[in-house]
Amino acid sequence: MANSNRVTVIHTGYSSTTIEEKDENLPFVRANCSCVLVTGSKNIIVDTMTPWDTNLILLSLEANGLTPDDINYVISTHGHSDHTGNNNLFLKAKHIVGYCISVKDKYFLHPFDKGLPFEIDEGITVIPTPGHTADDISVVIKTEDMGTVVIAGDIFEREEDIEQPEIWRSCGSVNPEQQEHSRAVIANIADYIVPGHGPIFKVTDGMKKKLSQNLSSELHVYRYSLAQKYVEVGV
């Protein structure tokens, strides 16, 4: 059967490290995340932005012939407020927020912390990619038109952070070394990456080499074994 999975970026994320004038005596920067709709065998929304973006999400769903009740899974790549703000719209969906999988008061046990992927359906898999936070996840989508698309959340801030790693490091990382592992793993399996705060981009061989070259030999073994594990389960 042909793969019907389709990836639509309904909002392209952005971020700035420029500190603006104080508001209510607090300095601030501006950011919002990429929000992605996956349609096909399952309907999935990934990273639901802030609570002030409700209308944008509802209009985007309507433009794709969907309502919140048509969504099977709502996924937040991690628990920060710009990635979870409209999860409450999707009360008929299973929710995955970082390593936590839940419906109402049911919390499903899955060993993301052991490096094991969670398969939603054929060609749709959630993998653990910690680093930005302790329990980041990425969504791996196999498509006919784009190959393998990885929705990576803030493991990648934007394409430019491959050549300028100070970009992602300055945006916060609980474990930079672990985040480097995750970035290399994602690049190894992706044809396209949707970063947390920038446009979708195509992964080149040069990018893969760049992301791997600073890893120690021990981390290369880890990255290879983890990538092989994903291949074995069909990621």
What are these regions (language model features)?
Residues M1-S41, A187-I189, D205-K210, R223-V235:
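Zn-dependent metallo-beta-lactamase
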Residues A2-V7, T39-N43, P117-T125, T143-T148:
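Beta-strand-turn-beta hairpins that frame and shape the catalytic cleft
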Residues T18-E20, V29-N32, V97-E119, R158-S170, ...:
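Active-site-proximal loop/helix segment associated with metal-binding centers of metalloenzymes
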Residues F28-A31, P130-A134:
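A short catalytic or substrate-binding loop motif that flags glycine-/basic-rich loops and adjacent residues
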Residues R30-N32, M49-E119, R158:
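Active-site HxH/HxHxD metal-binding segment of metal-dependent hydrolases
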Residues V46-M49, N72-H80, I96-Y99, I127-G131, ...:
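Active-site neighborhood of phospho(di)ester-bond hydrolases with catalytic His/Asp-centered motifs
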Residues L59, N88-T133, D135-V233, ...:
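Metallo-beta-lactamase
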